Amino acid sequence: TKISNHINDFGSEGRDSTISTLHKADIAYAGLRKKCETTVVIRNGKRIGICCFSPNAVTVNILNITYATTLVRSLREKCDYVIVSFHGGGEGKEFLHVTREEEFCFGQSRGNVYLFAHACIDAGADLVFGHGASLR
């Protein structure tokens, strides 16, 4: 599963409880800055590397493209497939399409998701999928 923009909604207690529950259920996760930035799962004998990003505190930051591509390259070296997931982009009906520019939500930079995705592909990602904020 992906650690993303809501992981800190209930502070460190909620975050720790979520991580504990994932461990107990033997569910792999990635995207938690400095703790579990990437994960590798094995399915049908294939190593699948997963890294996840968002613009929020305690997550691996989508705004640091250099670091993101470093993680992707690291996974590429040891995995058969590399998957990148990210939460980014603006919010609201005016953001229904990718702008190819930096987008903001409530004053917070959500990054340039077009640039981010292409950088991850160039670094070796096999699949990049993104999701954004709720439409209002």
Role assignments for model-derived ranges:
Residues 1-136:
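Acidic, metal/ion-coordinating pockets
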